Amino acid sequence: MDSSIEQKYKQLLDIVPSVSRETMENLIQFESLILQWNAHINLISAATIPDLWTRHILDSAQIFPLCSHSLQWCDLGSGGGFPAIVIAIFLKEKRSGHINLVESNGKKVAFLRTVIAQLNLPATVYHARIEDIYQKIPISDIITARGLAPLNELLQLIFPLLTEKTIALLQKGRDYATEVKNASANWHFDLLKHTSKIDENSVILEISHIRSY
């Protein structure tokens, strides 16, 4: 590895210990594909390109250790592949597990499928609106979403996919407390808050036992 990649590898190990160099190489390949495709379709904001590794890849990577034992994952509104593709890369290293991605934008679906094929990832992309795939998605241990919708709306989208044991890992920004308060008016749920290792003003909400009033 050259010095810049070695530095990125050290940063990754701070987030997810014991990551293989093969996994690191897959993440670097993913980073390269994002940059190539972003010139043609809007996968990430141009303003965040200089911080792609930290703001998007490491930010996604921090989710995996929270439930690394889980085998069946589902990511809603997958967009440019955060956190879904990053999780898929870690699942590939485990040699077990699978993640289903749901995305309605055809160009982004094409990108996601290209990445999955090139990196040989254990993932499937559903080209559909979330509301249209409830009967198609296999039962999931973990559901993820990043920047998709306010928590109250997000729980409404997630609810039909839940089992008694399903856990939602939802990345939220500085207004998360207001979102939790608003959602609590309509939903019962157990909540664990994990402060982001990337941005101290952001959190990962670990939500379980979701039920409506």
From Swiss-Prot:
The record, for Pfam families, names: GidB
GO CC terms for this protein? cytosol
First-level EC class: transferase
Concerning Gene3D superfamilies, the annotation shows: Vaccinia Virus protein VP39
What keywords sit in the KW lines?
Cytoplasm, Methyltransferase, rRNA processing, S-adenosyl-L-methionine, Transferase
EC numbers: 2.1.1.170
Molecular function via GO = rRNA (guanine-N7-)-methyltransferase activity
Q: Which reaction does it catalyse?
A: guanosine(527) in 16S rRNA + S-adenosyl-L-methionine = N(7)-methylguanosine(527) in 16S rRNA + S-adenosyl-L-homocysteine
> Residues that bind S-adenosyl-L-methionine, according to the entry?
77, 82, 130-131, 146
Q: Where primarily located? A: cytoplasm
Protein location: Cytoplasm
The record's similarity note reads: Belongs to the methyltransferase superfamily. RNA methyltransferase RsmG family.
Function statement: Specifically methylates the N7 position of guanine in position 527 of 16S rRNA.
Q: Which HAMAP family match?
A: 16SrRNA_methyltr_G (MF_00074)
Q: What is this protein called?
A: Ribosomal RNA small subunit methyltransferase G
Q: Which organism is it from?
A: Bartonella tribocorum (strain CIP 105476 / IBS 506)
